[in-house]
Amino acid sequence: MMEMDGQQSAHGESYAYTSPYWAEFYDMWVEEIIGSAALTKDDDFFFNLLSPFLPNSTRVRGPLRVVDMATGTGRVIRGILQKMNSRAQGELPGDIQKELEIWGIDHSQAMINRAKGLLEDKMKPSTTIVWRTSAAANFVDENPELRNAVDLLIFAAGSIGHLTAHGERRKFLQQVVKALRITNPPQTPRSIAAISILKPDDGLQENCSEQHVAGKEVRFNAEMRKPSRQWPHLEYCKSETMTLKDKGILVNSFDLKIVETATGKLLSQEKYSWSLQVFSQTEWERELSDCGLSISQKVETGSETWYILHLANKKSLV
Ligand SMILES: C[S@@+](CC[C@H](N)C(=O)[O-])C[C@H]1O[C@@H](n2cnc3c(N)ncnc32)[C@H](O)[C@@H]1O
């Protein structure tokens, strides 16, 4: 099957998310930039997206199915499970947990491996997590079990900006329309896709569009040094990020050094990159409507604008 994947074709082996070192450093970097208080608020937000579906324990059409698109190191899934577990002490009937199936999908095997490692010891036998390495633009075609079978899809951290190939975002939205379960409100809650766009001055993906002049490099984030937990004898040193704007695409690149802590010896130094599409609200809302998705709500959180989407009446548009 032909895959459409802007990051893999633009960056190849230097694409940051293919590196197991970056996979570990990513979590430290996010915590530093976003802050642990804001990350905890995100967990509440993710759980609140799920809660309307929870009282519906008598399901006729299989489990309550959640897709975490571009799951990365599984931050969204960990947030949901932590909240589920704390509520489960009191309020949630056990059969609801058994019926919950969460899919973590990402095109990077390195990120999925880390997500699995972080989640394995937290999982209860009642939780089903399905991991898949698939590109966003093909995720239903590659996993046909998801067709008309997803109650909630979450695409966090503005990662939709990574769909930079021509037509890639539209192709992803068409997959979302195939995935969302056709429901019968008010008996069953309407299936939803929650997709976030980063606010322009967010630090996470150096997405400061106004500050960029075509062809001119801009520097973001100071150098960051952190010890590895996975490889305790090593430490990371990330350089500041260089950002170059070219035809509506921001290309971010940086060096990641791996240093032996005891001796200070430099073991490796790689240049990594990714790219992001500069967001245009008009274009985005036109694509949503062309693909058959309606906006139920827009929600502002700390650094993201969330679009809560449902199927427009005529699903046949795709
Ligand atoms: C900024 S991280 C977000 C990770 C996680 N969702 C979070 O909130 O922390 C971006 C993720 O998007 C993934 N990604 C980028 N483009 C993708 C694509 N076309 N298909 C699937 N995953 C993609 C990357 O591999 C990476 O794990």
What are the roles of these predicted feature ranges?
Residues 2-65, 75, 79, 83:
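Conserved class I S-adenosyl-L-methionine
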